[in-house]
Amino acid sequence: MSGYVGRLAPSPTGALHLGNVRTFAIAWLRARSLGGKMIMRMEDLDHPRDKPGAAAQAIDDLRWLGFDWDEEFVQSERRPFYRTVLAKLDAYPCVCSRRDVESAQSAPHSGEQLFYPGTCRGRFRSWEEAAEACAPRIPCWRFRVPPDTTVSFDDAFAGHVTQDVSATLGDFPLARDPDGAGYTLAATADDLDMGVTEVVRGDDLLPATPPQILIARAIGREPPSYCHVPLVVGPDGRRLAKRHGDTRIAAFRAAGVSPEKVIGWIAYTCGLSADDYPVSLADLVGRFSLAAIPHTAVVISSLPFA
């Protein structure tokens, strides 16, 4: 086995669908084609949005499709670890809502990221004091970004990326949790702790990368490499959702669609097959090439396998 370590990181906030399974397939094939190790990490920290049974269903769907992995972790079981990581960061509690941040902006910023002007810097002595001030809302932890902080990295798929984080994002949120158990901090800390060498994920998460690189370096570690691939979208160009029809893997299973048929569609959209004929995930390992994957989103205008 090579030194490559990848990871699959489903979230139980919803059912697996063609979009996230395609991204997982690219991540899995990338690792296995390089003789690497694969980690399964259930990212179940967003409790208000978690769906009952979704975690078990995701594992079952992935195994049905032919995925396997070498280690398995559950984020909700790792809260003490996130607390230790939070203690190493220059972070402070913030009570600002999204509307507060939007109204504080003096000029628009590109993309979906909001620039935070540091309103709560030095305002509260503790999380508890901030929580009392904004009750019943919950404060968040923010990472204090030093002036003139620019992050640059070479993405295996998206190419060279540079962002002046201090000028475009400011002090970014880490977690809306007293222990720091939230996506931005937890995903970064876990990737480092689990030895992940490359993060393969959808390009909707490209904006999350500069903050995660800053977190890694703040605790004295070098971040993994990154590879952000295009999403599967509906005709409106937006990520797959209920409005685009039922693309859940569970729905295809119930309709009698074979796992090889689903993987065949993924292979075709990734440039690994000339047609969407059925094929197993394992059979794609030898032919996988990151260079074959189109640099444009996959648009679903009608449901496959109908």
Where do the protein language model's features map onto the residues?
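Alpha-helix initiation and N-capping motif
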Residues: 55, 79, 98-101, 113, ...
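Alpha-helical structural motif
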Residues: 54, 85, 208-211, 245, ...
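Active-site cores that bind ATP or allylic diphosphates and position pyrophosphate for catalysis
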Residues: 100-241, 248-253, 302-306
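Non-catalytic terminal extensions that flank enzyme cores
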Residues: 1-15, 33, 38, 65, ...
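Short, structured secondary-structure boundary patches
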Residues: 57-67, 87-93, 111-120, 245-251, ...
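Short, mixed-charge aromatic SLiMs
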Residues: 46-56, 234-238, 286-294
